[in-house]
């Protein structure tokens, strides 16, 4: 028991020391290049409040939803090996139907067209 306590104290102390060093070390060496913002090779001269296309935002959110669908359906082959995979299949089909209905709605509302 005493070994566990000593190990926890040493780990906590080392973690605290490393975090403190990480906060103090960058403040010792301030360079103009490090203190200025970097925007993909361009100097930020204009305003940061530039308008963006709402169509681009909606298409990005749609792709994000379908990436989430893939992440949710990836464990499906392992779930099919359960003794009773009926509930898993029903939930997977419900998810696919819900996302297909959402995609059809976006398509009908012309939300996927890029022209403005």
From Swiss-Prot:
Belongs to the complex I subunit 3 family. Core subunit of respiratory chain NADH dehydrogenase (Complex I) which is composed of 45 different subunits. Interacts with TMEM186. Interacts with TMEM242. Keywords: Electron transport, Membrane, Mitochondrion, Mitochondrion inner membrane, NAD, Respiratory chain, Translocase, Transmembrane, Transmembrane helix, Transport, Ubiquinone. Its EC number is 7.1.1.2. Pfam families: Oxidored_q4 (PF00507). It is a multi-pass membrane protein. It comes from Osphranter robustus (Wallaroo). This is NADH-ubiquinone oxidoreductase chain 3. It is found in: Mitochondrion inner membrane. GO terms for cellular component: mitochondrial inner membrane; NADH dehydrogenase complex. The chain crosses the membrane at residues 4-24, 56-76, 88-108. GO terms for biological process: mitochondrial electron transport, NADH to ubiquinone. Core subunit of the mitochondrial membrane respiratory chain NADH dehydrogenase (Complex I) which catalyzes electron transfer from NADH through the respiratory chain, using ubiquinone as an electron acceptor. Essential for the catalytic activity of complex I. It catalyses: a ubiquinone + NADH + 5 H(+)(in) = a ubiquinol + NAD(+) + 4 H(+)(out). Its main location: mitochondrion. GO terms for molecular function: NADH dehydrogenase (ubiquinone) activity. InterPro entries: NADH_UbQ/plastoQ_OxRdtase_su3, NDAH_ubi_oxred_su3_sf.
């Amino acid at each position: 028991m005493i070994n566990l306590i000593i190990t926890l104290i040493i780990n906590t102390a080392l973690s605290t020391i490393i975090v403190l060093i990480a906060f103090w070390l960058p403040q010792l060496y301030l360079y103009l290049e490090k203190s200025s913002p970097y925007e993909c090779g361009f100097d930020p001269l204009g305003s940061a409040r530039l308008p963006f296309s709402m169509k681009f935002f909606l298409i990005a959110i749609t792709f994000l939803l379908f990436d989430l669908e893939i992440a949710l359906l990836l464990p499906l082959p392992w779930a099919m090996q359960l003794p009773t995979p009926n509930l898993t299949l029903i939930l997977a089909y419900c998810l696919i139907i819900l996302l297909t209905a959402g995609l059809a709605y976006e398509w009908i509302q012309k939300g996927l067209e890029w022209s403005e």
